[in-house]
Amino acid sequence: MTYTELVAAIKSYTENDYSTTDINTFIKNAEQRIHNTVQLPDLRKNVTGTMTSGNKYFSLPSDWLSTFSIAVINSDNEYTYLLNKDVNFVRESFPDTDSGFYGKPEYYGIFDDTTMILGPTPDANYSAELHYYYYPQTIVTAGNTWLGDNFD
């Protein structure tokens, strides 16, 4: 289903000629509700990055919706998956005041919508792989989307 077909279907169903702004708001809200409720396998991505020595924060991709998993990768290409914990647990368990408490991260917490906090704070640079659910581009700006093409 394309954007044009969706707008026509909304107008037909509601028997009303809403403005483009109102219809776009309706569509974006519906898309967001679906993406926040249902974890669709086709809406998963993975990225690699580096956990930086002495930095307890790890940046999330701009299209990040939620984390599926995050792992530290060692030089032998072995993965160690981090456990998700509350931010307060990470802060209290791994105080960032003494580098003697630094080590290979074992836990993460979602600090805000752009950052996760790691515990313990990395004592070296570590390769990491993040698997996550993402917000796809809205049909309002893309014209069509995975959700629109697979709505049946």
Language-model features: locations:
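Glycine-enriched, solvent-exposed interface loops adjoining structured elements
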Residues: 1-152
